UniProtKB/Swiss-Prot annotation:
This is Kaempferol 3-O-beta-D-galactosyltransferase. UDP binds at T276, W328, A329, H346, N350, S351, E354. Optimum temperature is 50 degrees Celsius. CDD domains: GT1_Gtf-like. It comes from Petunia hybrida (Petunia). Keywords: Glycosyltransferase, Signal, Transferase. An anthocyanidin binds at H16, H144, G369. Pfam families: UDPGT (PF00201). SUPFAM superfamilies: UDP-Glycosyltransferase/glycogen phosphorylase (SSF53756). Belongs to the UDP-glycosyltransferase family. Optimum pH is 7.5 in the forward direction and 6.0 in the reverse direction. Gene3D superfamilies: Glycogen Phosphorylase B (3.40.50.2000).
Length: 451
């Protein structure tokens, strides 16, 4: 087994590389004699490998494809993704050859973020197994797998005014709102680097030797059943926030969030956190502040200082008795505190899983990517939260959502029961004989038999 060498290809944007590394660390721990070479940009690797790691995980830097002196303009992250993909396959193949020479071990398996769609071609050229990781929900993978079917049934670029139309032909989905499909399926720029990447991925991922997913089977039974029938070894091995929780020793609470929560009533606090890549525009920040003030809802808000200037004048002073704004919060600890009654977020997949793990209902304000689809599932399928009225924060819409989720009435009870049920299912899935634990064992076996 000491000759096994897994090439791991990371997607170096947002939280993707960290999620892939978390799974690799679990595999490296289970397979101490297998070498895992983690191919990633130097910038991403340097942020991930800050503490000692397993001896059998070897970080290997590759180029990000950005020309010297390049200035990020209006294209933003999309442009950087395009530059990365332009040379990624060649850069990775060269790096893999160097890693093989350095280690004296040929590649026996290619593991990758599913966004690295060409990793399947690399595995095929090497005649080894290919294991792409899908870091989001089974449902969002499904719509990319069925993009051609959706485009056949829905005229591309023709959805304006039809956003509320209900689709019933996508396998695994009883119903799906047309406007809840991710951008790039039938709306938005279908030729952008990101849209093209997702389309290619959806068309090629069926060739995978195994397809691990950052979710648990009990969350999406009909979708999982359909995808299991389409793929070899479709393996839900998450939620990663439960299987690979961050080491508590590294978590600080420099702003005293937990001590502040200790003084609040049980289930009364709205925790607001939009992650690292999505912040509402100024008018929505102002509307949220007005709603919190008028409703006198206790709140803990994780927000960078530079955004505070958009609040109504005097807001911080007037709400100081029941509100706290910090530039960073220990989110997992905050959500698991008994005083928190709702999590207001962008409906990114990591945030949804953290809500489920903590048993805290959600108010969603989706922005891009899979956010709209996640919001649909949260509100209409799992019934563990609500999407903000109209999809953007207004004062009245925010007050309505807060009232729906925090009021001690039938709706609040139903939300808490639903998310409590999914919390229990998630914990059982990652338990000793749970579905995710059993799927992980299968993945371990596949790693050592896929060359």
């Amino acid at each position: 087994m000491s000759n096994y060498h897994v090439a791991v290809l990371a997607f170096p944007f947002a939280t993707h590389a960290g999620l892939l590394l978390g799974l690799v660390q679990r595999l490296a721990n289970a397979l101490p004699n297998v070498t895992f070479t983690f191919f990633n940009t130097s910038k991403s690797n340097s942020s991930l490998f800050t503490t000692p790691h397993d001896n059998n995980i070897k970080p290997f830097n590759i180029s990000d494809g950005v020309p010297e002196g390049y200035v990020v303009g209006k294209g933003g992250i999309e442009a950087l993704i395009g530059l990365f993909f332009k040379s990624a396959k060649e850069n990775i193949q060269n790096a893999m050859a160097a890693a093989v020479e350095e280690s004296g071990k040929k590649i026996t398996c290619v593991m990758a973020d599913a966004f690295m769609w060409f990793s399947g071609e690399i595995a095929e050229e090497l005649s080894v197994g290919w294991i792409p990781l899908w870091t989001s929900a089974a449902g969002s993978l499904s719509v990319h797998v069925y993009t051609d079917l959706i485009r056949e049934n829905v005229e591309a670029q023709g959805i304006a005014g039809r956003e509320d139309e209900i689709l019933t032909f996508i396998p695994g989905f009883a119903e799906l709102r047309l406007g809840s499909l991710p951008s790039g399926v039938v709306s938005g720029d279908l030729e952008s680097p990101f849209s093209v990447m997702l389309h290619k991925m959806g068309k090629t991922i069926g060739k995978a030797t195994a397809l691990p997913v950052n979710s648990f089977e009990e969350l999406d039974p009909p979708i999982v059943e359909d995808l299991k029938s389409k793929f070899n070894n479709f393996l839900n091995v998450g939620p990663f926030n439960l299987t690979t929780p961050p080491p508590s020793a590294n978590i600080t609470d420099e702003y005293g969030c937990i001590a502040w929560l200790d003084k609040q009533e049980p289930g009364s606090v709205a925790y607001i956190g939009f992650g690292t890549v999505a912040t509402p525009p100024p008018n929505e920040l102002k509307a949220m502040a007005e709603a919190l003030e008028e409703s006198k809802t206790p709140f803990l808000w994780s927000l960078k200082d530079l955004f505070k200037s958009f609040f109504p004048e005097g807001f911080l002073e007037r709400t100081s008795e029941y509100g706290k704004i910090v530039s960073w919060a220990p989110q997992v600890q905050v959500l698991s505190h008994g005083s928190v009654g709702v999590f207001i977020n962008h409906c990114g997949w990591n945030s949804v899983l953290e809500s489920i793990a903590a048993g805290v209902p959600v108010i969603c304000r989706p922005f891009f990517g899979d956010h709209q689809l996640n919001a649909w599932m949260v509100e209409k399928v799992w019934k563990i939260g609500v999407k903000i009225e109209g999809g953007v924060f207004t004062k009245d819409g925010t007050m309505l959502a807060l009232d729906l989720v925090l009021s001690k009435d039938k709706r609040n009870t139903e939300l808490k029961q639903q998310i409590g049920m999914y919390k229990e299912l998630a914990l059982n899935a990652v338990g000793p004989s749970g579905s995710s634990a059993e799927n992980f064992k299968k993945l371990v076996d596949i790693i050592t038999s896929c060359n």
